[in-house]
């Protein structure tokens, strides 16, 4: 046995349909396209979205909404996360750099602190935005809020 004698396994390959190669092939004549009509002609291509003449779905449904190019998408971080960070690393100041080092945000993200959970540590917190409840909780614990 050598490379020139190799053949594919029995039944693993099928012979290709050779359409339009005369009547002896069994696929000559109309070449599986039927008789006449637009679909039998050369260059026929089904139009994308065409539904046989009925009003297509993309024209039946209304247009709605838009994408606001000025939207700022904040990365939300709760005060209970700040509490855990302060306890684990004995921090008094939590800013963007500390959140990046801890892996909560990437350098391009904008941060908003939310008021879910409880905060007992006295912290100086730096962020781009704060919810009212988060701001109140940080100040109630004796901390300060710095908006960037």
UniProtKB/Swiss-Prot annotation:
Keywords from the UniProt entry: Ribonucleoprotein, Ribosomal protein, RNA-binding, rRNA-binding
PROSITE patterns: RIBOSOMAL_L15
GO terms assigned for molecular function: rRNA binding; structural constituent of ribosome
Region: Disordered, residue numbers: 1-51
Gly residues: bias regions: 21-31
Alphabetical list of Pfam families matching this protein: Ribosomal_L27A
One GO cellular component term noted in the UniProt record for this chain: cytosolic large ribosomal subunit
Residue ranges with Basic residues bias: 33-44
Domain of life, source organism: Bacteria
GO biological process, one term: translation
Keyword RNA-binding attached: yes
InterPro entries linked: Ribosomal_uL15 (IPR030878), Ribosomal_uL15/eL18 (IPR021131), Ribosomal_uL15/eL18_sf (IPR036227), Ribosomal_uL15_bac-type (IPR005749), Ribosomal_uL15_CS (IPR001196)
Classification via NCBIfam families: rplO_bact
Family: Belongs to the universal ribosomal protein uL15 family.
Chain's role: Binds to the 23S rRNA.
PANTHER family reported for this sequence: 50S RIBOSOMAL PROTEIN L15, LARGE RIBOSOMAL SUBUNIT PROTEIN UL15M
Quaternary organization: Part of the 50S ribosomal subunit.
Name under which the protein is recorded: Large ribosomal subunit protein uL15
Organism of origin: Parabacteroides distasonis (strain ATCC 8503 / DSM 20701 / CIP 104284 / JCM 5825 / NCTC 11152)
Gene field: rplO
């Amino acid at each position: 046995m050598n490379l020139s004698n190799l053949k594919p396994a029995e039944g693993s390959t099928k012979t290709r349909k050779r359409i339009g190669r005369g009547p002896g092939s069994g696929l000559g004549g109309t070449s599986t396209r039927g008789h006449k009509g637009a679909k039998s002609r050369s260059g026929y291509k089904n139009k994308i979205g065409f539904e046989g003449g009925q009003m297509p779905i993309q024209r039946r449904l209304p247009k709605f909404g838009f994408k606001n190019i000025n939207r700022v998408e904040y990365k939300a971080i709760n005060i209970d996360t700040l509490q855990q960070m302060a306890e684990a690393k004995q921090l008094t100041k939590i800013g963007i750099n500390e959140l990046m080092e801890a892996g909560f945000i990437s350098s391009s993200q904008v941060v908003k602190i939310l008021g879910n959970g409880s905060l007992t540590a006295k912290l100086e917190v730096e962020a781009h935005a704060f919810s009212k409840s988060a701001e109140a909780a940080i100040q109630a614990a004796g901390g300060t809020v710095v908006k960037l």
